[in-house]
Amino acid sequence: MRVNNLTPQDLKAYGINDVQDIVYNPSYDTLYQEELNPGLEGYERGVLTNLGAVAVDTGIFTGRSPKDKYIVRDDTTRDTLWWSDKGKGKNDNKPLSQETWQHLKGLVTHQLSGKRLFIVDAFCGANADTRLSVRFITEVAWQAHFVKNMFIRPTDEELVGFKPDFIVMNGAKCTNPQWKEQGLNSENFVAFNLTERIQLIGGTWYGGEMKKGMFSVMNYLLPLKGIASMHCSANVGEKGDVAVFFGLSGTGKTTLSTDPKRRLIGDDEHGWDDDGVFNFEGGCYAKTIKLSKEAEPEIYHAIRRDALLENVTVREDGTVDFDDGSKTENTRVSYPIYHIDNIVKPVSKAGHATKVIFLTADFGVLPPVSRLTANQTQYHFLSGFTAKLAGTERGVTEPTPTFSACFGAAFLTLHPTQYAEVLVKRMQAAGAQAYLVNTGWNGTGKRISIKDTRAIIDAILNGSLDNAETFRLPLFDLAIPTELPGVDTHILDPRNTYASPEQWQEKATALAKLFIENFEKYTDTPAGEALVSAGPKL
């Protein structure tokens, strides 16, 4: 049903001319037929799997390309944005001149002109008061499918008179040959203009650039209104108790929040306002490397017709080899959130969070779980430590220790302390407690099992961890439970997983130094200086 009389003439306002045809808010059936069109070539063409989902290949970009991210520096952003060339903290918000922006915009609009285009109008944000109305324009059917999965799908009534607050023009097939003269990183670009409210994409086919692009925009708009904007998953229990799970890619946000005992609010991006926690998205974007029906049944069963697989190995008979990471470790699937049975309906939002869980994937120093004080909560939120997992960004093939402010520095557009201040206010008002959970490896090099981690999460959510006897871990001064139901007691103290305590001490000292060095960038403010004592002490 075409409920919006969008015509090629309307696209001239964006600089897109002579459009052959517009496929507006296509149905899933239409997208299925378009993606499997035998006349398609290269990365446009999808492959049907035996699970019913279509699989696509995103080319050389199997993750985001943060080094190719730019934001126009103008009167809107000059004094508010967290720029890469100001202050001590490193980030990906590289300034772009108005002149270069116009050049990039010309490249993308030229690429989209004269084509048959897919246009998807959708919402970012489950709260009608603060949601963004976003218009996605692309010439690739599966990219339209991706945003239909990932963003909130408007009703026919909501599409009548839909007025976009933000435009995303995806010109994946075009590149910028003048990048060297313009002082850019490469011929590829992901550029934002917060005055014009437009995102441009060139050279990369990776669907996640559209998803995380809008997250970056929400991260700019909401905290300025006193609303927490969070890189987290969230779910709610039978009694209405809400938990949020912060963490970088691959640390377990999607897996751990998808729990048969609790209803899912969302798996990656949320806001927290006066009414409670709400999802930005209408879908999930789960990692599928080594996915099994036994370990993650809900995610496995979500991979069916209308789901979209990325960069997986599809055998000749249509079966999927989820264990094959030869293309990338960052294999993914996007699916509409209703592919998970146990979700919050009809709107993905709930009350205020009482449990805040920081997920980290560490290499044998941090314990599987610890309970944080108020100051430790701020310290570890600003530190955002994890080992960056292979494949989630271009060029990352080995796990490396990294500090990502607020567990999502790549998507922050304001200074990290602004997110910490808003989160702490929301937590204090709700009486929320924070925990640090290590989903990574122990001293033997063995990854902490999903079974043990799920038992730890259960202990947090049912309150048994708060009542458990604890001991303090040296250097980091973390409160660790002596035992928890369903968890191997031996692993709770990370020192037990080494041949000798001295081996742990050596690795722990090295990690503590990294924490201390990283946190120095926050000590230029009194608030940051006051938090130093909540971190490790040598």
UniProtKB/Swiss-Prot annotation:
Q: Where in the cell is it found?
A: Cytoplasm
EC number annotated for this UniProt entry: 4.1.1.49
Detail which positions bind substrate: 64, 206, 212, 332
Per UniProt, the cofactor note for this protein states:
Binds 1 Mn(2+) ion per subunit.
GO annotation terms (biological process) = gluconeogenesis
Which InterPro entries is this protein grouped with? PEP_carboxykinase_ATP, PEP_carboxykinase_C, PEP_carboxykinase_N, PEPCK_ATP_CS
Q: In which pathway does it act?
A: Carbohydrate biosynthesis; gluconeogenesis
Keywords assigned by UniProt, alphabetized:
ATP-binding, Calcium, Cytoplasm, Decarboxylase, Gluconeogenesis, Lyase, Manganese, Metal-binding, Nucleotide-binding
GO molecular function per UniProt = ATP binding; metal ion binding; phosphoenolpyruvate carboxykinase (ATP) activity
What is the catalytic activity of this protein?
oxaloacetate + ATP = phosphoenolpyruvate + ADP + CO2
Q: Where does the protein principally reside? A: cytoplasm
Q: Name one GO cellular component term.
A: cytosol
The UniProt annotation places Ca(2+) binding at 149, 151
- Function, as annotated: Involved in the gluconeogenesis. Catalyzes the conversion of oxaloacetate (OAA) to phosphoenolpyruvate (PEP) through direct phosphoryl transfer between the nucleoside triphosphate and OAA.
Q: How does it assemble?
A: Monomer.
Q: What name has this protein been given in UniProt?
A: Phosphoenolpyruvate carboxykinase (ATP)
Q: Which organism is it from?
A: Salmonella typhimurium (strain LT2 / SGSC1412 / ATCC 700720)
